[in-house]
């Protein structure tokens, strides 16, 4: 197992610049710092004499968001936590989407959907985050066979995986509200 930086991955077929081997994403032990949890402290520049341009870069990098964490329960008794800047749209959530790498995917995928989910996860692992997040990329995904319950109205809603949801962003899970979000509308 080797870790490569983005600039070491070349071509549309995503191969290693050194040996030409196809590059795939793998789950490896690594460290992440959740800067958003410390956003208020990190954004306190009162003691720093930084140029405004640098302060703006820091604000954008830290990514402070106002909103609410909401927990959806699954039929299997698991909990899917999402973060939303629009808690008022909870009533309109009609499905959920997990990142293909989300740890709950294994536990909520039905036996009937397992093969299709595994194939999709492998396909997503061959794409870079930049490719997955591209605005012009077709939104694709597969149904896990699992369901969650909307916490405000109790409705049973399907849980999908899709490569436009990133495990490294937020909780790696979203509630989908097609009436209020263009990506959710396109995916639906």
Predicted features and spans:
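Conserved, charged catalytic cores of large soluble enzymes
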Residues: 1-137
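Catalytic alpha/beta core of large soluble enzyme barrels
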Residues: 102-187
